[in-house]
Design a protein with these regions (language model features):
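A short core secondary-structure module
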Residues: 158-207
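Glycine-rich phosphate/cofactor-binding loops in nucleotide/flavin-utilizing enzymes
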Residues: 2-13, 84-85, 101, 247, ...
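Glycine-rich beta->alpha junctions and the first turn(s) of the following alpha-helix
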Residues: 13-20, 24, 207-312, 378, ...
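Internal helix-loop-helix
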Residues: 60-125, 166-172, 325-329, 370-373
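A structural signal for short hydrophobic beta-strand segments in well-ordered beta-sheet cores
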Residues: 146-149
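Glycine-rich phosphate/pyrophosphate-binding beta-alpha loops
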Residues: 162-168, 261, 377-384
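C-terminal helix-coil-helix/basic helical segment that borders enzyme active sites and/or dimer interfaces
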Residues: 37-46, 281, 285-292, 308-341, ...
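A short, Trp-centered hydrophobic/proline-enriched beta-strand micro-motif
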Residues: 124-132, 176
Length: 403
């Protein structure tokens, strides 16, 4: 007796499942498949930008304010719901799943600025860009050289930043810089964050940008930025100098802010892999060779089984880590684990999906190549796989002298 195949999209597990979460997941899924996917299939091959209309609709649905307090217009939900929405959007286009994180930068601003910009951010009308990496400082954040020199009324920023995605369209650039000269014996000392406010579509005085040509992550542009006596007012220093007395407080602030982005990246990785799996399941039932659908062959069926199993395992860990984060638990190690495992899985699964599609997968006629290109990036940004392994091992083993 024949039976219909099961839906590869697993429901939220019983311990975490609520009616509200089911509704949020279904809303995000419907929006992703009906609105985002057609736009992605049209614009990504030509390196087009995410349309303003799509961003506006995302704001109306609350995607930019998932974790923002209700008094600012946000939904005041948790990392768990954030991950649910991210996976669904990433299944269609990772860039759209990524842009919802840009509103969160308003949460780290000083109180007066937070009051002004957060209500706009939760509607997607004020979004940020993060400028941390430099030509000589990628994984080694403590080696940043961009300087912040104190002057009357504020600071002057000088230096270069790399991989600043959305820098042109952002309303604010959050810059990691030093307010003290670099000291190789105290590398973590003097690292601070500065909010550089600007008009969307332009760079402020003292800032210039050159777009970086990428093989993926289209939908928005990524820049190398140069800061040349860029003036930042005193109230744009994130965290008061008086409150942050520890020499490495700024570094710790930047490092501590990485847990939620790593869960976010795990969700993006899972969404990409799921898109590749779902497309592969459909393809193998249509594509025929040797007189029958290739989905009838054991080699293909086992590929599908392995892909689905890997996705499910990573999703289960993501749910656990997200729930723990919402409960206030420290998730430095588990956040690194889920980011590491999910990104590695995503590259394997999307590559296997391309193999299943054969030559067709190596064309822009199918979105598989987009999932494959974008999945490769998840092993690099928000901390490389090697840095994730370093974080995990440092939690499990005594400190190494090789620093």
């Amino acid at each position: 007796m024949s039976r219909a195949p099961l839906d590869p999209r697993s429901p939220i597990p019983a311990p975490y499942r609520t009616g509200e979460r089911d509704a949020i997941q279904e809303m995000a899924r419907s929006f992703a498949m009906n609105k985002v996917l057609p736009v992605a299939n049209r614009l990504d091959p030509e390196h087009g930008l995410i349309p303003d209309e799509l961003r506006q609709e995302m704001g109306e649905l609350g995607f930019f304010g998932i974790m923002a307090p209700e008094r600012y217009g946000g939904l005041e939900l948790g990392v768990f719901e954030y991950a649910l929405v991210t996976e669904e959007l990433s299944r269609a286009w990772m860039s759209v799943a990524s842009i919802i994180a840009r509103s969160g930068m308003a949460l780290v601003l000083n109180p007066a600025q937070r009051e002004k910009y957060l209500p706009l951010a939760v509607r997607g009308e004020w979004l940020g860009c993060f400028a941390m990496s430099e030509p000589g400082a990628g994984s080694d954040i403590a080696s940043v050289r961009t300087r912040a020199a104190k002057v009357d009324g504020g600071w002057l920023l000088n230096g270069q930043k790399m991989w600043c995605t959305f820098a042109d369209q952002a309303d604010c650039i959050l810059v990691v810089a030093r307010n003290k000269p670099y000291d190789p014996d105290r590398r973590h000392s003097g690292i601070r964050q500065f909010a550089v406010h600007k008009a969307s579509g332009t760079f402020p005085e003292g800032v210039s940008g050159n777009p970086i040509k990428k093989i993926g992550y289209h939908g928005w542009r990524t820049f190398e930025l140069s800061f040349d006596d860029c003036f930042v007012p005193d109230d744009c220093l994130v965290g008061s100098e008086r409150a942050e007395t520890a020499a490495d407080a700024g570094f710790k602030r930047a490092a501590a802010a990485m847990t939620t982005p790593r869960i976010h990246t795990a969700a993006r990785s899972i969404g990409l892999a799921r898109g590749a799996l779902e497309d592969s399941i459909a393809y193998v039932q249509q594509r025929e060779q040797f007189g029958r659908p290739i989905g009838d062959f054991q080699v293909t069926r086992f590929k599908i089984a392995n892909m689905a199993s890997e996705i499910e395992a990573c999703r289960a860990l993501m749910y656990q880590v997200a729930a723990n984060a919402d409960a206030g638990e420290k998730c430095d190690m588990s956040g690194a684990m889920v980011k590491y495992l999910a990104s590695e899985m995503s590259e394997r699964v999307t590559s296997e999906a391309l193999q299943i599609h054969g030559g067709a997968g190596y064309t822009t006629d199918f979105p598989i190549e987009r999932y494959w290109r974008d999945a490769r990036l998840t092993k690099i940004f928000e901390g490389t796989s090697e840095i994730m392994q370093r974080i995990i091992s440092d939690h499990l083993l005594p400190p190494t002298p090789l620093r």
